[in-house]
Amino acid sequence: MTRLTTEFWISAYLKRLRLEAIPAFITKKGDSISGAVIVKINTLDGRAQSFYKTYNFELDEWRWDILISGSDLEVENSLKKQKTIDQDLWVIEVEDREGRHLLSEEGLAG
C-alpha cells in the first residue's frame, strides 16, 4: 500500500477542517515526508487534548489515540516535551468549542 507523505495528509486535513469552518493551524512543521503528527484540540475554555496516531495490531488498523487531556497548560507542556524528543514532529492545533477534530472521519482515521 502506498503511503501519503505527511505534508500531503496535513494539507488534506486542514482543507477538511476549513470546509467544516473549524479553525486550525500548524504550530510546528516537521519532516515533510514521514514526520509524525500530533493534533491538539483547544476547546477555548482552558481545556485541551492532544491525539497521536498509533497502530492497533489486534484490529490491524491505524487509529488516533489521546496522548493527553487536561488544562491547556498541561497539554502545551506535554507538546513541548514531545517537540524536543522528535525534531521531525508536526503539531496541528484545532480550535473548536465543541471539540470537533474530524479524526474519526473517513480518509482521516486510518
PLM segments and residue spans:
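Polybasic/polar functional segments that serve as interface/processing modules
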Residues: 1-110
